[in-house]
Amino acid sequence: MIPEEMFPGLVSAGGVVYRCCGKSLQVVVCSRQVPFSNNLPKGTPDPGEILEQTASREVEEETGLKVEILDYVGFIEYDVNQGGASGKSPKRVYYFLMRPVGGDFSLHDNEFDIVQWVKDINISSTLTYDNEVDIVKKGLSMVKRRSKGTP
């Protein structure tokens, strides 16, 4: 499902978790108060995990939802501060399109203060980072194509 190329930097995996609500779509957003941010759920692989396993596990830990992976959406890249003399390191986050199949927000871990559904029309003004907005838009366009039966 994901490119087989090796990435020399840090790697994480996460999810664009969606649900249909009437005629609109909603996406899970995780919020932190200090420092303030609204993000998609994601995290670092445990030893021996493939990225799909990491994405599912991290989404369940951070949101409380059990999910099913439907497709690979894409990745984003950015630099993270590593501290010390090395400065910044590149990081790549792989995202998967997911739907909830169980669980509940009340079961989320303490990494985020709030986990909530956000309407698709509000996602651009809600998420902190534009690259995550782009991933959500790509994922939701995949959902819309699926519902119309087009590849």
Segments and roles (model prediction):
Residues 39-42:
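A short gly/proline-enriched turn/hairpin at secondary-structure junctions
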Residues 28-32:
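Short, acidic/hydrophobic/Gly-rich beta-strand patch recurrent on exposed beta strands
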Residues 45-134:
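Unchanged
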Residues 1-22:
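Acidic, metal-coordinating catalytic segment for phosphate/diphosphate chemistry
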Residues 20-26, 84-88:
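Short, solvent-exposed loop/turn segments that connect beta-strands within catalytic domains
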Residues 14, 26, 114:
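Conserved beta-strand and immediately adjacent loop positions that scaffold enzyme active sites
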Residues 34-36, 107:
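A conserved beta-turn-beta hairpin within the catalytic core of GNAT-like acetyltransferases
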Residues 125-151:
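Charged phosphate-binding loop/patch that engages nucleotide di/tri-phosphates or the phosphate backbone
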